[in-house]
Design a protein with these regions (language model features):
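Short amphipathic alpha-helix used as the core "switch/output" element in two-component signaling
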Residues: 52-64
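The feature encodes the CheY-like receiver
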Residues: 2, 47
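Helix-turn-helix DNA-binding segment
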Residues: 134-171
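Acidic catalytic/metal-coordinating carboxylates
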Residues: 24-27, 50-53
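Active-site residues of response regulator receiver
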Residues: 43, 71
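Short, flexible helix-to-coil linker/hinge segments that flank and couple to helix-turn-helix
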Residues: 77-84, 89-143, 147, 189, ...
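Short hydrophobic/Thr-rich beta-strand motif most characteristic of the beta2 strand and flanking loop
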Residues: 15-23, 31, 185
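Basic, Lys/Arg-enriched C-terminal extension of HTH/homeodomain DNA-binding domains
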Residues: 177-205
Length: 205
């Protein structure tokens, strides 16, 4: 649904056109190879993959292709990960249409797009040095662990997550154990409740 809305928003602009879209990372990589776009818009939430993994994959094969992340997820947690992976901008879906269009044009022109809040945070971290410990325990999770945590919070079971991520159940169980350790959660029930609460909090932003 969001892809359709974004397509309509872009296609209404006389100087912009959508040459394709994709629901999965594999579809995206194939489409990029076939259409050779000037810009790729990435959502952090992908079926069976991390958006940051896709960004890294695109960067490895198309080094000069600019990427903009448009996501519902809190920029304070995801934006720096996306930028480190190779994205040139991050804008939240809740932003006005004019902000999204401005971000697209800035990244197309070779500039970075960051919100004032995010830019200020990054400058502060650079000037004063990154803290020894992440501000929130959730920030200690790796990209893949964060994907698993989000899927758990969406009510998906271990087997479903394994199928969507195309890994074994044992791998997902390993992720679950590492997440519990990093978040100081003792039981699987605590993990599920914590994940659900976090996903609901993200949705209400």
């Amino acid at each position: 649904m969001f892809r359709d809305g974004l397509r309509q928003l872009i296609d209404r602009e006389p100087d912009l056109v959508v040459c394709g879209d994709a629901a999965t990372a594999d579809e995206a990589m194939r489409g990029i190879g076939e259409t050779r776009p000037d810009l790729v818009i990435v959502d952090i939430s992908l079926a069976g993959a991390s958006g940051t993994d896709l960004i890294k994959g695109i960067k490895s094969q198309h080094e000069d292709l600019p990427m903009l992340v448009v996501s519902m997820h809190d920029e304070s947690l995801y934006a720096e990960r996306a930028l480190r992976a190779g994205a040139m901008g991050y804008v939240m879906k809740q932003e006005p249409a004019k902000t999204v269009k401005s971000a697209i044009r800035k990244v197309l022109a070779g500039d970075m797009h960051l919100s004032e809040k995010l830019a200020s945070s990054l400058v502060s971290r650079f000037m004063h040095g990154a803290p020894d410990q992440p501000a929130r325990p959730i920030e200690t999770l790796s990209d893949r662990e964060l994907v698993v945590f989000r899927m758990l919070g969406q009510g998906k079971g271990t087997r479903q997550i394994a199928a969507e991520m195309e890994v074994t159940v044992a791998t997902i169980n390993s992720f679950r154990n590492r997440i519990k350790e990093k978040l100081n959660l003792k039981t699987s029930t605590e993990l599920m409740l914590h994940a659900i609460q976090w996903v609901q909090g993200e949705a209400s932003r």
